[in-house]
Amino acid sequence: MSRLGRRRRVGYGSVLLATVITVAFAYVAIRGVNFGELGQSLRESNYWWLIPALVTLALGFFMRVLRWRVLFSPRTRPAIWPTTQALLVGQFFNNILPLRAGDAARIVALHSLGGSSRAETTATVVIERFFDVLALLLLLFIGLPWFPEVTWIRAAGILGIALTLALVVAVVVLRVFGERPVRFVLRPLARLPFLFPERVEAAVRNLMQGFIALRSPRLGLVAFLWTLLSWLVLAMSFWFVVLGFDLGLSPAAGLLIVIATGLSMIIPSAPAAVGVFEAAAIVALSAYGIPQTNAFSYALVVHALNVLPFVVAGLVVLNVNRRVLQLASGRARRKERIVGAQGFQAVGVPVRVGGNSGRTRDDEHDVTEPADRQLDVDEVREPR
């Protein structure tokens, strides 16, 4: 089978898996729901609480903007406004496309709007995901005294401490041995039938560049603190919605719901994690004895609160920057034609034009030709 055929099979398989998972979780979420009581619960809720919930949600989003900027090298750190717009674009596409396609979209958007390197931006997204999971598990462990005594909660809290210790070990290993351990672990994966050597190589490269933040104690600590604060603020947003449904729960309930729904984002699913989000919220509320119908009505509203504003804001950003993004797309196409016709042998950079997509194999650092002729190339990675 050709490489293109393998890629298509992997893509179709991923979408199929996400669809199956979404249907399964949606079934779990709505099974046993009394739709008559559901309508009554939605009608009787106090939606004025959505105002403070939306304000704190916006504050948490801004903290994520600051967190993302911190992960960049001080020399290449993008400005706040392009970073904010790119993150909104990413949220928009995560809410309309499956498999967290918004992560790729915001990499492209930040490159177009802020001029950031695609390689470095990809690395920051990788480390963001790592920090998010670690922060949620750590908050789960810290919150154990205030959470209901449920077996799965305590087991997950212990896992959080184990991963925290693993992070310390990983940082020490990276400082002593560099990238060799990562390559040793990931290189054999290239032999698997559903992976490609270049993808594994890219994963090693992105992971290592992402861990630069962890190898700088100050940079890693600041980014992780922003991560913790953003999740805590988001927990307050969720708790304000709890007050709107008069569930009689403490702020700790908002934190537990955020932890459950946040960790559920790891699971491949449909756009906006429909079904998966609701099931996770119901599981969290079930620890407090909240009936499934009431929990489901709450999940619907808090999910809409976390989706609709970002869809609207993302559309606005895309519309305002339409010309910039179109010009960036045109530059990319011109770059492909130049690379395909001439290559970069003159400047000593090995470049291979990649089959169907026409993208260059190495396109991640700036390259400048002699002064008499400037190529329209934004980023080409230096030769190894």
Regions inferred by a protein language model and the residue ranges of each:
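Membrane-embedded helical hairpins/re-entrant loop segments and their flanking transmembrane helices
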Residues: 65-89, 242-257
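Helix-boundary and loop/linker segments of multi-pass membrane transporters
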Residues: 8-9, 39-46, 75-80, 113-114, ...
